[in-house]
A protein has these predicted regions:
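Class I S-adenosyl-L-methionine
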Residues: 19, 35-39, 53-61, 73-257, 321
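C-terminal target-recognition/interaction regions appended to catalytic cores
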Residues: 221-329
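Short, well-ordered alpha-helical scaffold segments within catalytic/effector domains
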Residues: 11, 111-118, 149, 283, ...
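Short, solvent-exposed loop/turn segments at secondary-structure junctions
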Residues: 12, 33, 69-71, 140-141, ...
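Short SAM/SAH-binding signature in class I
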Residues: 61-67
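Short, conserved catalytic/metal-binding motifs centered on acidic residues
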Residues: 64, 184, 305
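SAM cofactor-binding core of SAM-dependent methyltransferases
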Residues: 4-54, 65
Length: 329
């Protein structure tokens, strides 16, 4: 079985997806709560800071995946946000050229953590044992993160990788929620492409069975929570910045983006009665985790919100590791 190293591994979404397509591995995670969940789930785990490790510590790994925390690079076009982005893009270019990067920049969690996957990739290349496949994904600040992945792509192509970047919609990969994720897939031994959606995109007001007949319907909340009966979810976020105008979706639609605030979502019955809020297991189902996944530790809602949806992870890892002939076909 192919072996992977998973950086910023969280509770295990990337691992479960990777294992589904034949890639086993070990994850590095610093958060004690996420580590508790991983251990309970039987996932191979190193509890530590990815900055203290490197490829030499995991010599069997030929695949690298990562979902580095990407701090807010821009808030309302702030000068500080633009400067942070400029610093990161400059550092990516410098690292590719093997020139020194300001240690203060690398030590700043706002900028340094998003550079860690590149440090690992380049170190593996320079050691003569390069990763044959790379998968990077992130949900926060999608447009800004995509700039970083595009800068990574320029460096990796110079090193001989085939690279594809883009923004994917989770409901098109069998996840019962609408969410966009900025992704990068790369491989060293052949061409690569982003995974093709298997399901239709969600459009408000368009029936689940309508649209491109070549694709399967998106999944609704009711599809994975059939025991719940009829309900409407009321978002904890206001539409257009108006806290009084909270979005609503019925069980016949996908969930809103699952975030660390999912425990605040209200569920109401058709007659207006308040229903019990989502359990951790139910919230995990909306991210593609098994119903009995052993969520552990504290701040479980945040763990769930931070996780990579399992089905999307499987599609990404398969795209990066499938035989080259499949891509060419």
């Amino acid at each position: 079985m192919t072996r992977a190293i998973h950086l910023f591994a969280g509770p295990g979404g990337l691992e479960l997806g990777a294992e589904a397509v034949g890639v086993s591995g070990v994850g590095i995670e610093w958060d004690a709560n996420a580590v508790a969940t991983r251990v309970a789930a039987g996932l191979a785990t190193v509890h530590g800071d990815v900055r203290r490790y490197g490829p030499a510590d995991f010599p069997d790994a030929t695949v690298l995946t990562a979902g580095p925390p990407c701090q807010t690079y821009t808030v309302a076009g702030s000068g500080a946000g633009r400067q942070a982005m400029a610093d990161v893009l400059g550092a990516v270019k410098a690292m590719g050229a093997r020139t020194a990067v300001d240690s203060g920049l690398l030590g700043d969690e706002r900028t340094g953590l998003v550079l860690e996957p590149l440090r690992w990739i380049l170190a593996a290349l320079d050691s003569g044992r390069p990763y044959t496949a790379v998968v990077l994904e992130q949900v926060q600040q999608v447009q800004q993160v995509q700039q970083v992945w595009n800068a990574y792509a320029e460096v990796l192509r110079v090193e001989g990788y085939s690279v594809a970047t883009g923004v994917l919609r989770t409901e098109q990969f069998g996840v019962p929620q609408t969410r966009r994720r900025a992704v990068l897939v790369a491989r060293l031994d052949g061409p690569v492409a982003l995974p093709e959606p298997s399901r239709r995109p969600y459009r408000r007001g368009v029936a689940q069975d309508a649209g491109d007949g070549r694709l399967e319907p998106w999944l609704s909340m009711g599809d994975v929570l059939p025991h719940r009966g009829p309900f409407t979810v009321i978002s904890n976020y206001g539409t257009g910045g108006d806290a009084r105008n909270r979005g609503r979706r019925t069980r016949r639609e996908p969930a809103f983006t699952v975030t660390g605030k999912i425990s605040r979502l209200r569920l109401v019955a058709p007659d207006g009665r308040e229903l019990p809020r989502l359990s951790h297991g139910e919230a995990g189902l909306l991210q593609g985790f098994p119903a009995e996944f052993p969520w552990s530790g504290n701040d479980v809602a945040q763990q769930i919100g931070n996780a990579c949806p399992v089905q999307l992870a499987a599609a990404l890892v398969h795209a990066a590791t499938q035989p080259a002939l499949e891509v060419a076909a």
